[in-house]
Curated annotation (Swiss-Prot):
Protein name from the UniProt record: Progranulin
Gene3D superfamilies assigned to the protein according to its UniProt record, in alphabetical order: Granulin
UniProt-annotated glycosylation sites, renumbered to this chain: 197
Entry similarity comment: Belongs to the granulin family.
Biased composition (Pro residues): 368-385
Presence of keyword Transport: no
Organism in which the protein naturally occurs: Cavia porcellus
Post-translational modifications: Cleaved by ELANE; proteolysis is blocked by SLPI and is concentration- and time-dependent and induces CXCL8/IL-8 production; granulin-3 and granulin-4 are resistant to ELANE. Cleaved by CTSL in lysosome thus regulating the maturation and turnover of progranulin within the lysosome.
Task performed by this protein: Secreted protein that acts as a key regulator of lysosomal function and as a growth factor involved in inflammation, wound healing and cell proliferation. Regulates protein trafficking to lysosomes, and also the activity of lysosomal enzymes. Also facilitates the acidification of lysosomes, causing degradation of mature CTSD by CTSB. In addition, functions as a wound-related growth factor that acts directly on dermal fibroblasts and endothelial cells to promote division, migration and the formation of capillary-like tubule structures.
Keyword tags: Cytokine, Disulfide bond, Glycoprotein, Lysosome, Repeat, Secreted, Signal
Assigned GO CC terms: cerebellar climbing fiber to Purkinje cell synapse; endoplasmic reticulum; extracellular region; extracellular space; Golgi apparatus; late endosome; lysosomal membrane; lysosome
Span of the signal peptide: 1-17
High-level lineage: Eukaryota, Metazoa, Chordata, Craniata, Vertebrata
Protein's gene: GRN
InterPro entries: Granulin, Granulin_fam, Granulin_sf
């Protein structure tokens, strides 16, 4: 315990400062170092507290499901919500930082401050005195009867004992919303309260393991294993083939792939109602889901979003349950970002703050055809190798359980990734301090193509390319395997596509179920669901299209695409082929500008 020196001098000389016994001057107080032989300047109002670095607020959110694993969705002083890199946290007044539960923000928001007994000055005491919540929060009962913390002052506790709403708002548990006179917004989920005076061994302040960023978010993983919905919602398949979120648990997904109904009700699409034995309710509209993007460790294994890839003692990849984590030297444990591993105490340390470290779990094989993170859409890739092969480029690949590495010659080689080997310069692979034998040579994707592709007795193209006849005679090499040569003699398309010379694109035709549909005559008599104009109507789930006579016609697809010939239409997500008789999926379109141009062939020896 530090002893403060010169309090009487402090009162009399705030401007001049404090002169310590060793003649140095301190602005507030002098504190003797261990042993008492020397002194250091200190501030008793700050130095007797545990401090930790605050976190930066991230992207906007509506619920914890919008944030990476281990993050929380906190309400800011501006009334908005943002992701904080702590599982339970509060936003700082500066609007840019946040602190973990059990801490206060410093004035500038850059530091999180905690008293040694973890009993916060200004913390909200729950009835009974056994539990407390952070300042500017509200105590609410949880499902198990214990106390939880709503991260808003004077909040309204919802009857389900799971959610809460801001002061003055009412809970709409049917639609999972907080309703005010100005509008509505999603319900907030309560957090468990913390026991008062919680301390670790020898009085060392710690953070409860339940409050670590390793805590899983409250979310529902959809059947495709890559989309997720907020807690207390239901995944429903949309017409696009992706998953949407119905805003209630155990909901009924309607057959139109657009609406949903509460549990124990039936969808009545004709009347747009949810029917039950007692009463009918209006159909609910589904909301988009959020996609979970895996963290790739290498070409074969990955970790869930919000986790970090770390090497295990076996050399294989493991997953640390923190984002941007610190991998400990024992290859078994890991710590949150900003902490260091203390192997003797089995803890993670940041200044005076200590938290238990986490144990890594083995990484999982990457899911096939995993989508890329959001970004500008590029052209679909040409057909690749079988999923069991590890593709190095369009021509060569490695066997399963390997990674592609460049040899000294510039050619491809293979290292055994299943044993944790990494690529090294030259002819070797390495894992830790252990070298592997020489790299194995990669093999061609098609083992039968061991020589150039012969166009005729005079010309040939490299392996993995296709011979195409030129318009003026002779041959050109299409830089795609098994390609389709276009009739203009200048372009080519990947296998499975057809050439649309007029549109300068490669198109993949839809199956028979997506042939363009002829337009039907609209009705002028009865009152139907979709109004076209000029007193013309189409049935519900149909689309109004102009016909060739300038009048209205009905497309049998919901949100259909009207073809330019004014006689046909296509489903949503497709576009009409130039002649209007077929529908082409938008994702099955390759513009010629995005494809390699045919090159000159090689003379045969």
């Amino acid at each position: 315990m530090w002893t403060l020196v010169g309090w009487t001098i402090l009162v009399a000389g705030l401007v001049a400062g404090i002169r310590c016994p060793d003649d140095q001057v301190c602005p507030v107080a002098c504190c003797p170092d261990s042993g008492g032989a020397s002194y250091s300047c200190c501030d008793p109002g700050v130095d007797l507290r545990t401090t930790a670095l605050s976190g930066y607020l991230g992207r906007p959110c509506q619920s914890p499901a919008n944030c990476p694993i281990g993050h929380s969705c906190v309400l800011t002083a501006a009334g908005t919500a943002a992701c904080c890199p702590f599982s339970q946290a509060m936003a700082c007044g500066d609007g840019h930082h946040c602190c973990p539960y059990g801490f206060h923000c410093s004035t500038d928001g850059g530091t999180c401050i905690q008293r040694p007994d973890i009993h916060l000055l200004g913390a909200v005491q729950c009835p009974g005195g056994e539990f407390e919540c952070p300042d500017s929060s509200t105590c609410c009962h949880m499902l198990d009867g214990s106390w939880g913390c709503c991260p808003m002052p004077q909040a309204s506790c919802c009857e389900d004992r799971v959610h809460c709403c801001p002061h003055g708002a009412s809970c709409d548990l049917v639609h999972i919303r907080c309703v005010t006179a100005l509008g509505s917004h999603p319900l907030t989920t309560k957090l468990p309260a913390q026991r008062t005076n919680y301390t670790g061994a020898e009085g060392t302040p710690v953070v409860s393991p339940g409050l670590l960023p390793a805590a899983l978010p409250t979310s529902v993983i959809c059947p495709d294993s890559r989309s997720q919905c907020p807690d207390d919602t239901t995944c429903c398949l949309l017409a696009s083939g992706e998953y949407g979120c119905c805003p209630m648990p155990n909901a009924i997904c309607c057959s139109d792939h657009l609406h949903c109904c509460p549990q124990d009700t039936v969808c009545d699409l004709r009347q747009s109602r949810c029917l039950s034995q007692n009463k009918a309710k209006t159909l609910l509209t589904k909301l988009p889901s959020w996609t979970v993007w895996d963290v790739e460790c290498d070409q074969e294994v990955s970790c869930p979003e919000g986790q970090t890839c770390c090497r295990l003692q076996s050399g294989k990849w493991g997953c640390c349950p923190f984002p941007k984590a610190v991998c400990c030297e024992d290859h078994v444990h890991c710590c949150p970002e900003g902490f260091r591993c203390h192997t003797e105490k089995d803890t993670c340390e940041q200044g005076l703050l200590q938290v238990p470290w986490a144990q890594k779990t083995p990484a999982q094989p990457s899911r096939p055809s995993q989508p890329s993170p959001p970004g500008p859409p590029g052209p679909p890739s040409p057909p690749g190798p079988l999923r069991s092969e590890i593709s190095c480029d369009e021509v060569v690949s490695c066997a399963p359980g390997n990674i592609c590495c460049r040899l000294a010659s510039g050619e491809w080689g293979c290292c055994p990734s299943s044993e944790g080997y990494l690529c090294m310069a030259g002819e070797r692979c390495q894992v830790g301090d252990r070298l592997a034998p020489e790299k194995m040579a990669a093999h061609l994707m098609s083992l039968s193509q061991t020589t150039d592709v012969g166009c005729d007795q005079h010309a040939s193209c490299p392996v993995g390319q296709t011979c195409c006849p030129k318009l003026g005679g002779g041959w050109a090499c299409c830089q795609l395997p098994h390609a389709v040569c276009c009739e203009d003699g200048q372009h080519c398309c990947p296998a499975g596509y057809t050439c649309n010379v007029k549109a300068r694109s490669c198109e993949k035709a839809a199956d028979g179920a997506h042939l363009a549909a002829p337009l039907a005559v609209g009705s002028t008599g009865g009152v139907m669901d979709v109004a076209c104009g000029d007193r013309h109507f189409c049935h519900d789930e149909q689309t109004c299209c102009r016909d060739s006579r300038g009048g209205w016609a009905c497309c049998p697809f919901h949100q259909g695409v009207c073809c330019k010939d004014q006689r046909h239409c296509c489903p949503a997500g497709f576009h009409c082929e130039s002649q209007g008789t077929r529908c082409v999926h938008k994702k099955s379109l390759l513009h010629w500008d995005s494809l390699p141009r045919p090159a000159a062939p090689r003379p045969r020896l």
